[in-house]
């Protein structure tokens, strides 16, 4: 976790697949991700529609490019969203103390190939997600998997963009 805390910024491309019990094939989306320490994370979905999620401090902004609609949420007023956001952001920050505030944390592997399992401790968040799994190599997070409480799941694979 200490090494992750040293990363000041990172950029990558993602492909996310959502596996829903009611569908035979996964839903797929793709786009770009950008991180700037300590608290800014941007997810720009480019396909199948253009949408942006920007986490900056304690605010999450959701913007639909097609409709022009923009919504802003304060994390502390939305505990489930806050928990999800901190699961990703605190991992990128190497902030184990904050992770433990929201999750039971288990780290496996070594620096070259690691896996972090996060089990929500907050009851409302447990109703949404059973577990979040992040995997990486060195200071790069290359995989995020969210296992929802109802059995659906999403897998996100992240490839690094050259700086």
Pin down the residues of each PLM region.
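Flexible, processing/modification-adjacent segments and terminal tails
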Residues: 1-19, 24-26, 40, 64-121, ...
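Residue-level recognition of well-ordered beta-strand positions that form the cores
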Residues: 13-15, 32-34, 44, 117-119, ...
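Amphipathic hydrophobic-ligand
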Residues: 25-31, 131, 152
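An acidic-aromatic
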Residues: 32-83, 154
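Short, charged/polar low-complexity linear motifs in solvent-exposed/disordered segments
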Residues: 60-62, 70, 80-81, 88-90, ...
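Gly/Pro-enriched, hydrophobic low-complexity segments
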Residues: 96-163
